[in-house]
């Protein structure tokens, strides 16, 4: 995983939420890049990209998760940022919608995903691959598996930065993925016989950038002058 302190992507995502609470002109991602990042912040390889937008709120000196939603579908980056900046801020079912009074305490992260590789699959004549073929701190992980009782298909993912933040090893990562998917009652069963229940394990990499309120607020005046 590579980490940039700020980028046009993160600023643009924050701007989408800000515009929900204040009347501001519509701007393009290119405008942000030109006026705040000297035209050098956009990367051609991410013109279309899967992405996740993460919101964290400063509380007791630490930033704590306030919302995170994204997509593995590859779409136009500007449209994806518009959509998932708001969905993650206002529609993450784990949290209440972010309110205007919280803006000054927020940090917005944007993770652009790439290098997807299926490292294990149960399809075909037999199981193939290695579920351990990934590196903590470099890869995000998505698993797809069958519920032991209902046989329904379940899935969950953790972005590359989540695993080292939590201090998990590889096995603990899979255990927490199973729990996240809603299968906590059968965690031990699934892990003990993962060859039976796992359908697919996919690793991927992320390029993450973040922007906190102070930097975002400073950039607002520059963008306003551009319009």
UniProtKB/Swiss-Prot annotation:
Entries under SUPFAM superfamilies matching the protein: AMMECR1-like
Organism superkingdom: Eukaryota
Annotated Pfam families: AMMECR1
Disulfide bond positions: none
PROSITE patterns in the record: AMMECR1
Residue ranges annotated for the AMMECR1 domain, each copy included: 5-220
UniProt cross-references to NCBIfam families, sorted A to Z: TIGR00296 family protein
Name of the molecule in the record: Uncharacterized protein KLLA0D02464g
